[in-house]
Every structure is written in structure tokens, then in C-alpha cells.
């Protein structure tokens, strides 16, 4: 069985009190800020002609992705490579899961290969927590169902931090399918922990009413209300299968009510735009908004590598400590 977080925390090399990154609920504001500070240092490394450092040489990182991913998987692999870690990737199609192997068996086989860090994306909420209980490897959650996506939220707040003086004075609106969004949940956890004010906006069928009280946010079904006094608007990708489930009538109607346009930018001259990607152009955001100078979407992508370098740097075991 895995060592408990409390005992493992004593051995953390750089001050975090956690062995894993499963979700952000146990992380305090100072721990989040520490990860952001570390990521900012690696952001500067990525601007150098030589972008690789030997920090995790000899450390092994396995990416287990049981859902499709492009940006997150590539970002984690690049981050591990920039730190000189040994990397191996496994997808559902190439794993023995297709032959009936359980997640627990997969974890034990990975551990038997002496893998230090497992980056896991899985369609089942709680899968990373399960893995953390049955292996001694460090587990990093790369997205589990609609539950959590902690590194996405951390790279988002890292991106925001470059444009604000204080999170305590920051107003962020998250717009879209909140109910089914792990990105929204993790961003709410990070932002409220740091002291920001968060508004959730979307169709009534996509707004979980329990989040307003449980997570100290406000909700609205009106885009204008969400953008009033807002500093940063984060649009979420609409999953087209939700239309088939009757959660919104059509993409045209969704865009009419919740799509952000150039007109919104004209009416809110200081508003910054974010999106975790991939963007459905013409639905969540118009082309003009995606490509606008106040869109910081590409900064999110760049910061993703730096943030994941920071997470690996802080949580991965050092070979000299083994």
C-alpha cells in the first residue's frame, strides 16, 4: 500500500505537504502560490536557447491516458523531457485494458517497473485517488471524468497572475457547461482559495445549483450579468453530445445567448479572454475574439509546460534521495 500523505510530506524536498496532485481541495493558498512561483522560474527557462535542465535525470514518468488528449499529454511529456526525466506513454488503445486488465493491475505493473511518477487521465471520477491508494508512485491527475483537472486550473491561474496585481481584487467569470466541466471545478477551487471572486454562467441545464453554496461562487444564466465588472472571462468548450441530450437547443442558440463576440470586447474594454481549449470557433468565441490582442489563450498553452515542469519538479522523487 502507498505511504500516507502525512508521512510522505516529511520527505517533500521543497515544502509542499502532499505526495500527490489529485485535486486542489487540500492545497492551501501558500502551496498554490509556491507552485506558481516555481512555474514562473521554469517559464523563464523556456525562453532560453537551451530549454533543458538535468533536475530529474534518472526519474521515470509514465503517462497513462485512457481518454483522448493532445495538449495535456504533449505538455506533460514536454515538461518531463525538459527536466531530463525518462518518459513512457500509454494510451487505452495500446494498453492491456482492452484485454480486460483492471486499473489496479495496470498500476501494479507500472510500479513493478519502478516508475516514479504516473500521470493519469481517466474517464472515471476518482480514478487517480484509487491509484494513489494502491501504488507508491507519485500520482498526478491529468483529468478524471467531470471531477478535477488540477494542472489545467494551475496553469490558468498562472496565466491570470501575469495580468493582475492581486487575486483578492480579481473577478473571474467562467462561462459554459459548468456541470460537466472538470476544468471549471478545479478553477473554482484554485481561484476561491486565492481569494478571487468567481461567477459561473451558462444555461440553467448546465449550472449545478449546489456549487453556489458549496464553493462560494455566484451563478447567473445571463452573459451580460457575468461580464459586468468582470476582469477575466473564461469560456468553456461545449461538448456537442450535450445537444443530443437536450441540454441546449442548438449551437446557434447557445452562441446567441452565451457566445462572446467583438461587441462584448468593445463594451468591456479591459476584459481579458481565456479558454482551456480546444475552442469551437463561432460557438463559445468568435474568430475576432480568439485572435484579439486581449485573448490570452496562447499564453495558457505556453504556461502549461512551465506549470507541469513545476509540479514534476516539486513532487517527483529525486534519484539522490532514493
From Swiss-Prot:
Alphabetical UniProt keywords: Pyrimidine biosynthesis, Transferase
Keyword Transmembrane applies: no
One GO MF term attached to the UniProt entry: amino acid binding
EC category name: transferase
A Pfam family reported for this protein in Swiss-Prot or TrEMBL: OTCace_N
Enzyme Commission (EC) number: 2.1.3.2
GO cellular component: cytosol
PROSITE patterns associated with the record: CARBAMOYLTRANSFERASE (PS00097)
GO BP of this protein: 'de novo' pyrimidine nucleobase biosynthetic process; 'de novo' UMP biosynthetic process; amino acid metabolic process
Metabolic or biological pathway, per its Swiss-Prot or TrEMBL entry: Pyrimidine metabolism; UMP biosynthesis via de novo pathway; (S)-dihydroorotate from bicarbonate: step 2/3
Binding-site residues, L-aspartate: 99, 182, 237
Residue numbers binding carbamoyl phosphate: 71-72, 121, 149, 152, 277-278
Cross-referenced InterPro entries: Asp/Orn_carbamoyltranf_P-bd, Asp/Orn_carbamoylTrfase, Asp/Orn_carbamoylTrfase_sf, Asp_carbamoyltransf, Asp_carbamoyltransf_Asp/Orn-bd
Catalytic activity: carbamoyl phosphate + L-aspartate = N-carbamoyl-L-aspartate + phosphate + H(+)
Self-association state and partner proteins as the record states: Heterododecamer (2C3:3R2) of six catalytic PyrB chains organized as two trimers (C3), and six regulatory PyrI chains organized as three dimers (R2).
Functional note: Catalyzes the condensation of carbamoyl phosphate and aspartate to form carbamoyl aspartate and inorganic phosphate, the committed step in the de novo pyrimidine nucleotide biosynthesis pathway.
UniProt record similarity statement: Belongs to the aspartate/ornithine carbamoyltransferase superfamily. ATCase family.
Protein's recorded name: Aspartate carbamoyltransferase catalytic subunit
Amino acid at each position: 500500500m502507498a505511504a500516507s500523505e502525512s508521512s510522505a510530506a516529511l520527505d517533500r524536498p521543497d515544502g509542499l505537504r502532499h505526495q500527490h496532485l489529485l485535486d486542489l481541495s487540500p492545497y492551501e493558498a501558500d502551496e498554490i502560490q509556491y507552485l506558481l512561483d516555481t512555474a514562473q522560474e521554469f517559464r523563464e527557462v523556456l525562453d532560453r536557447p537551451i530549454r533543458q535542465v538535468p533536475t530529474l535525470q534518472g526519474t521515470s514518468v509514465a503517462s497513462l491516458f485512457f481518454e483522448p488528449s493532445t495538449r495535456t499529454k504533449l505538455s506533460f511529456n514536454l515538461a518531463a523531457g525538459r527536466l531530463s526525466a525518462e518518459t513512457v506513454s500509454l494510451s487505452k488503445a495500446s494498453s492491456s485494458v482492452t484485454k480486460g486488465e483492471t486499473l489496479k493491475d495496470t498500476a501494479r505493473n507500472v510500479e513493478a517497473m519502478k516508475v516514479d511518477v504516473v500521470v493519469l487521465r481517466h474517464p472515471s471520477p476518482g480514478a487517480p485517488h484509487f491509484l494513489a491508494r494502491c501504488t507508491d508512485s507519485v500520482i498526478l491527475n491529468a483529468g478524471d471524468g467531470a471531477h478535477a483537472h488540477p494542472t489545467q486550473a494551475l496553469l490558468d491561474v498562472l496565466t491570470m497572475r501575469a495580468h493582475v496585481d492581486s487575486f483578492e481584487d480579481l473577478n473571474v467569470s467562467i462561462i459554459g457547461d459548468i456541470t460537466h466541466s472538470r476544468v471549471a471545478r478545479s478553477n473554482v477551487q484554485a481561484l476561491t482559495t486565492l481569494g478571487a471572486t468567481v461567477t459561473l454562467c451558462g444555461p440553467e441545464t448546465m449550472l449545478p445549483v449546489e456549487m453556489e453554496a458549496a464553493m462560494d461562487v455566484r451563478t447567473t444564466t445571463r452573459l451580460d450579468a457575468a461580464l459586468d465588472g468582470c476582469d477575466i472571462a473564461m469560456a468553456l468548450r461545449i461538448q456537442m453530445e450535450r445537444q443530443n441530450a437536450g441540454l441546449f437547443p442548438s449551437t446557434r442558440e447557445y452562441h446567441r445567448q452565451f457566445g462572446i463576440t467583438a461587441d462584448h470586447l468593445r463594451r468591456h474594454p479591459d476584459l481579458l479572454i481565456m479558454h482551456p481549449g480546444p475552442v469551437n470557433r463561432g460557438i463559445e468565441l468568435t474568430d475576432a475574439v480568439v485572435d484579439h490582442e486581449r485573448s490570452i489563450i496562447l499564453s495558457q498553452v505556453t504556461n502549461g509546460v512551465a506549470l507541469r515542469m513545476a509540479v514534476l519538479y516539486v513532487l517527483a522523487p529525486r534519484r539522490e534521495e532514493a
